[in-house]
A protein has these predicted regions:
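Short C-terminal boundary/hinge segments that cap the last helix of small helical domains
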Residues: 59-68
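Residues in the helix-turn-helix
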Residues: 25, 36, 64
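A short, Lys/Arg-rich alpha-helix, primarily the initiator
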Residues: 1-25
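Short, basic-rich loop-to-helix N-cap that marks the start of a DNA-contacting helix
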Residues: 43-56
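Short alpha-helical "recognition helix" segments of helix-turn-helix
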Residues: 26-27, 54
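Recognition helix of helix-turn-helix/homeodomain-like DNA-binding domains
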Residues: 31-46
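Residues within the alpha-helical elements of helix-turn-helix
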Residues: 18, 29, 57
Length: 68
């Protein structure tokens, strides 16, 4: 199993907009660095655990943010 995952940037951005949360606010809520949230918003690979923290902070599953 890969230690990194790539999420669908559109899904991340849409969920952030739906919840009216900024990248900085999401990073703080998830306990990750702003750069990790920025990578996810750009569709770049991040550590699986980081994606899990961000998904949990958004109240969604990692799978719902994954590219399909």
């Amino acid at each position: 199993m890969s230690k990194s995952v790539t999420v669908d940037r559109v899904k991340v951005i849409a969920e952030m907009a739906k919840q009216n949360i900024t990248g900085e606010e999401l990073a703080q809520k998830a306990g990750v660095g702003r750069s990790a949230v920025q990578k996810m918003r750009k569709g770049q690979a991040v550590w699986r655990t980081t994606a899990g923290h961000v998904a949990a902070a958004l109240g969604v599953s990692v799978e719902s943010l994954m590219e399909q």
